[in-house]
Structures are given as C-alpha cells and as structure tokens.
Amino acid sequence: MLGGELAAMIFADGPYNVPIVGHVSGLGKVRHREFAEAVGEMSAAEFTAFLRIVMRNCARFSSRGSIHYHCMDWKHTREILDAADGVYAEFKQLVVWQKDNAGMGTFYRSQHELIFVFKSGGGKHINNFGLGQTGRYRTNVWSYAGANTFRKGRAEDLAAHPTVKNLALVADAILDCSNRGDLILDPFSGSGTTLAAAHHTGRRGAAIELDPLYVDTGLRRLCATSGLTAIHADGRSFDAVAADRTRERETGND
C-alpha cells in the first residue's frame, strides 16, 4: 500500500476494546454496528497483544524518529503502555483531549480522551512547535469540540461513525510533527479524519480499514471535505465502482 515508502508520522485511533452498542453509541435514532474487532471480547492480555502487533507494524512501516499518536481511553492506560514497552524508543507525552461536552457514563461522565505520543526508533524527531517561537503555542491539553457538541455538521459526523475524531485536532497534530509532502499513516481509518487532515495540511495520507462500510465512509468524507474524486486502482471513480457493485448485487453476480 505504501509503495515501499516509510510513513513520516502515525495517527492511530484504534478500537478501545469496549462495545459500541450501548457504550459508545446510544439507543437513540443514530445507531452503529460493532467494529470488526476489539469491542470488548478481548481479555486485558489479549488486548495488549493486539495493540503490540499494531505498534510493531506502525514502527516497521515508518521512518526512524517518527512520532506516533495513539488514541485510547483512560481505562486501558495499562494495556497501551505495556504494549508500547519494547516497541517504541520513548514515551514522549500524554495529551489530554478536553471536549466541550461529556459523553455517556454514570460515575463522572467522561469529557476527555487520551492521546499517547511515542517516538519510534532513534534519530531526530520533527518538532514544528518548540517553545512557541514558531508561532505554534502547544501544550499537552488540547481543547477541541467532540462529536456530540452542537455545531454545524454534528448530525453528519454522528451518523457517519461512532467515534469521529475532530478534524482540526488531527490536522494540528500533523502540523506539529511532520512536514509538507510527508506521508501520514492511519492504521484504523474509520471515518477518514486522518486522510482529510493530511490533505488539508499539504501532506499525503495512507490508511487501512477492515470494515467495508467505513472504507466507503472515509472515502466519502475525504471527497466531501477536499473536493477530490476517489479513483480506484483500475481507473474507475468511486461512484462508478459503487454503481457497478450495486448492479452486480441486483443481478446476483459476485
């Protein structure tokens, strides 16, 4: 997929090993199916092993010194740190994404998510913010609206994916630790936020997604936010492929 090129930065928002139905997505009008894996069926040891495989592959297909952002909830802090041990050269920072509104929950409703920032391998990493001398004043508390904040586009985001990340949040992370033209890799594409953010910041995006539904979701979101047309490897447009596959289903052909 990468054509032999190594990614300059990773932004990963993988599953948190919690159910989507009744936990992340409520019982209202907008409902979502479960992710392909890691939706509560894994033990702590199994989830740690799952995360370690992800991280090892991220390290394998990225440049030395690259910065890797991994999103996670507070309940799985131990698993993600244990998974990273021995894979990454350094645990650079723990970022708190502070949202406008709290999500579901009973004993203190959660109004934040965590982003674990690691450095892969030796070598110098990219730091475009420093101490603010470049005009980018950055701390480890990031305040961005969550998907449930009342705003323009809220309904579309909630309908597209149960855990949509804020586009500006990901774009700022990309601006922090990569340069124009760099390749940004997302191993869990989901709603396609990283691809859209890479485009808007002058980078190139590459992403992996297991669920065909969210492959389509990510491509549609990228096209909508960028004005680009998605082209299949065989030269057909996204709409043409969709029309062909619909026709195949209707005629009973695989």
Residue locations for each model-derived region?
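Core catalytic lobe of class I
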Residues: 1-215, 253-254
